[in-house]
Amino acid sequence: MEKIFQNVEIKPLLIDFSNPFIKNAAKKLFQLEEQLPLVPVNVVMDFKGINRAAVHGLSRVLQDEIPNYMLDIKPGGYKIEDSTDLFMTEQFIRNRINFIPIYAENESLVFALRSLNNSCEVKTIYTRDLIQVAGPKLKYPIFNPTFEIGFLQPGKSLIIEDIYIKKGIGRKHAAFNLAVKTHFSHLDIEQYPTDKKEYMALSGYKQSSMTSDPRHHRLGLCFPAVPMPRINKAVRTYLKNACRVIIGRIQSIQKIYENFEEPQPELVLFSMDEEKTKAIITIKDETHTIGNLLKTCIYEMIPDISFVGYQCVPHKQEMVLTIIHKASQEDLITLLEKSIQNIIQMFQTLEKNIDELIA
């Protein structure tokens, strides 16, 4: 397969210390003399030779369908008897701690917050007030010291133990989102000029991307917290992990029909008439992301297919794929296998391209 990953631009968002106003503000508020240890990183990527569903799938997985980490408070960690500021409720503080942008590689670290306001003014609590109480010594910070956690009135205290690192995915809790601001566009569809779009309220493309089958795409996103010395390595790891997540989810579908001659509740095959076969495949805990990718790639593999579609069933946490084709049961399974192998090969090639392009 030809090179899919054509180009990448990686741009960290740095503090402009050349601006005296920004420099003085950083020094006054946070005692900063240099860049923060973690920075947001904008990434713009160009892909060629793949369908719209593949780029959409990569975008969705990078944002909220890939395992990531957040900070959370263990049950009983918020010490109610020692926390005397009634405005700083457990839920308020938990939400703030959940959404601290972090760069973590495991779940072994534990932190605590023990803050007392002895002044006559309101005290702002920042992430720099967190102290590590368990886990290996850090080679670099996993969060910036400047994120606001809460506030303390004069004479009040806030005590929290057992702030730990939790693993999950963004579609179940937004704090686990890996990338933010994901967006993609198609470079091989002619667009209206910007002024014309605003004046005539046009969508942008002169032809619908649903019917034009674009093959040249640009995907943009932002990783909120990446260590300064490891920007390229972190971006490369994130992108490769996203490819592996998609490959793993596609491979799990293979296992459903590998022994299709044996009765399986996840796979129903039957003949509609002398020519057509209908397959209904139920995939647990799957989403629109993989459904759309499968549907598009099966259509590409079998252009004369009678029907292919999917339905997500949220209350059952499953996705149901339906295929109807003029073929025997064995031939239909063979065609489905080829379609899935094409998807796996596509993302394996993309993973290889990522290694080649991001040093």
Swiss-Prot record:
Keyword terms of this UniProt record: DNA-directed RNA polymerase, Early protein, Host cytoplasm, Transcription, Viral transcription, Virion
Recorded superkingdom: Viruses
First-listed, main subcellular location of the protein, grouped into a coarse class: host cell
Disulfide topology: none
InterPro entries registered for this protein in UniProt: RBP11-like, RBP11-like_dimer, RNApol_insert_sf
Inducers of expression: Expressed in the early phase of the viral replicative cycle.
Location of the protein in the cell: Host cytoplasm; Virion
GO biological process, one term: viral transcription
Entry GO terms, CC: DNA-directed RNA polymerase complex; host cell cytoplasm; virion component
GO MF annotation terms: protein dimerization activity
Protein family membership: In the N-terminal section; belongs to the archaeal RpoD/eukaryotic RPB3 RNA polymerase subunit family. In the C-terminal section; belongs to the archaeal RpoL/eukaryotic RPB11/RPC19 RNA polymerase subunit family.
Record's function text: Component of the DNA-directed RNA polymerase (RNAP) that catalyzes the transcription in the cytoplasm of viral DNA into RNA using the four ribonucleoside triphosphates as substrates.
Subunit: Part of the viral DNA-directed RNA polymerase that consists of 8 polII-like subunits (RPB1, RPB2, RPB3, RPB5, RPB6, RPB7, RPB9, RPB10), a capping enzyme and a termination factor.
Name of the protein: DNA-directed RNA polymerase RPB3-11 homolog
Source organism of the structure: African swine fever virus (isolate Tick/Malawi/Lil 20-1/1983)
